[in-house]
């Protein structure tokens, strides 16, 4: 739930409780759940026999959706079995439109800044997820590169002419170069996290539908309160398309340079495991364009951010809490959405983790088999908590207690009833991943990787 809270993902948490007649004195399993959930939940209430049950549920749902936070209801055992003929609540008349159009003054000021900029760029964060098409349309009109935050990876496909990849520590030199060369930054739905690498010395137009996010960490040239899609559409109406396609041509050149650099890095294999460059090159080639990809934390995630080239995939990650073990449970949730939500029906679900991340929830692979969740899990096994080792070396400390004693994860997947394959040579990657992606049951590909080739 803390993951959901800091990533602003709505959650409705329903928890049980002992019967009301023994609640409070300290009976078996009697815990003050309201206090326990107080810090993580925006709304938390016990549901009693005399409560207005439909109204409490309506308020909980509204709090989760509007606040994009955790809402929590506590159900004592006896309340759960009370018969009721009360009418269920409805969102009708309870939630207004969520489109906030920026003021005319703000739009005019933004238009002037953009019109006078020679090298504008767009930084698209996860806050622009529902407005990504409008952002891309604006970028095309301006001839501007679009780089994403790491959490926003995939919001624009890397094969789009205006795409510049991910900005920051998990990103590409393409995005960094355009950031350095820019004379105006349009930040759309980005929180300015310290990993992102936005140059604060440059003029910034920041647009967000949450006023607290505007200039949150430092002043910006022009903070604009409004829905990002509404802003982009309004600016497109004010500005003529640019005839200068210089930056788009430079993007083509920079991508060619980066791909050549990746080929150079492929040659750095030291015989101590498969290079993550090779792995994500193959996955970029084979992963369906409409797939949903859940990534974990650690070196595997940094490599995914740099080397995986999106073609339309939806990416899920623990963006702000950085919870190790996130990928597989998130993939399970995404798979459930493919069964229930028309927008996601039929889409392939892939999860990516290191050995440390998979080790947090290994029994969930048996759950995949039990429920027929044909998720493909790609596991980078370097036999250590590689990110922690890297941080210890960077701090000039001894590398301490980061090595892992692992079983054969591929064999474990097979014992659970799924498909399991182990790859130790780059030449075997493509066939192994293709087979796993096409399996009609849960599949795991364990790839022995070099911890130092990130």
Which functions belong to the PLM regions below?
Residues 70-72, 242-255, 269, 444:
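Flexible, glycine/charged-enriched surface loops at secondary-structure junctions
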Residues 76-81, 252-259, 450-454:
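A short, charged, Gly/Pro-tolerant segment at domain boundaries
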Residues 14, 22-29, 215-217, 222-225, ...:
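Thiamine diphosphate
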Residues 1-243, 286-289, 346, 367, ...:
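N-terminal alpha/beta PP-like core and its mobile active-site loop of ThDP/TPP-dependent enzymes
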Residues 206, 294, 352-353:
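Generic enzyme active-site microenvironment
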Residues 53-54, 100-107, 168, 273-276, ...:
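A conditional alpha-helix N-cap/helix-loop micro-motif detector
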Residues 56, 105-109, 174, 231, ...:
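Well-ordered alpha-helical segments embedded in enzymatic catalytic cores
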């Amino acid at each position: 739930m803390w993951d959901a809270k800091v990533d602003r993902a709505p959650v409705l948490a329903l928890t049980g409780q002992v019967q009301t007649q023994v609640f409070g004195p300290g009976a078996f399993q009697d815990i003050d759940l309201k206090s326990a959930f107080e810090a993580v939940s925006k709304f938390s209430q016990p549901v009693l026999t005399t409560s207005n049950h439909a109204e409490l549920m309506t308020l909980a749902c509204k709090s989760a959706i509007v606040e994009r936070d955790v809402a929590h209801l506590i159900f004592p055992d006896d309340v759960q079995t009370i018969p009721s003929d009360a009418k269920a609540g409805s969102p009708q008349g309870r939630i207004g439109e969520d489109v906030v159009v920026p003021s005319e003054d703000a739009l005019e000021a933004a238009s002037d800044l953009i019109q006078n900029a020679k090298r504008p760029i767009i930084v698209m964060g996860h806050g622009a997820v529902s407005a990504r098409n409008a952002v891309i349309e604006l970028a095309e009109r301006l001839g501007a590169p679009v780089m994403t935050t790491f959490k926003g990876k995939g919001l624009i496909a890397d094969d789009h002419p205006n795409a510049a990849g991910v900005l920051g520590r998990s990103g590409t030199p393409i995005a960094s170069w355009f950031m350095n060369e820019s004379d105006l930054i349009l930040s759309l739905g980005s929180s300015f996290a310290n990993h992102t690498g936005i140059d604060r010395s440059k003029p910034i137009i920041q647009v967000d539908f949450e006023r607290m996010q505007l200039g949150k960490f430092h002043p910006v040239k022009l903070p604009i309160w409004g829905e990002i899609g509404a802003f982009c559409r309004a600016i497109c109406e004010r500005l003529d398309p640019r005839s200068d396609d210089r930056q788009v041509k430079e993007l083509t050149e920079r991508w060619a340079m980066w791909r050549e650099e990746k080929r150079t890095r492929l040659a750095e294999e030291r015989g101590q495991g498969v290079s993550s460059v090779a792995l994500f090159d193959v996955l970029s080639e084979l992963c369906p364009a409409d797939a949903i990809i859940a990534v974990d934390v650690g070196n595997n995630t940094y490599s995914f951010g740099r080397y995986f080239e999106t073609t339309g995939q939806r990416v899920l990650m623990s963006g702000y809490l950085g919870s190790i073990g996130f990928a597989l449970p998130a993939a399970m949730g995404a798979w459930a959405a493919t069964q229930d939500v028309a927008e996601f029906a039929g889409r392939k679900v892939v999860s990516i983790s290191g050995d440390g991340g998979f080790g947090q929830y290994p029994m969930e692979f048996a759950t995949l088999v039990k429920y027929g969740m044909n998720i493909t899990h790609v596991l980078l096994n370097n036999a250590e908590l590689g990110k922690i080792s890297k941080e210890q070396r960077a701090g000039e400390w001894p590398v301490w207690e980061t090595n892992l004693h692992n079983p054969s994860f591929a064999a474990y997947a097979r014992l659970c009833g799924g498909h399991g394959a182990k790859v130790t040579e780059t030449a075997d990657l493509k066939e192994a991943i293709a087979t796993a992606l096409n399996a009609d049951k849960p599949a795991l590909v364990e790839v022995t990787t070099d911890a130092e080739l990130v």
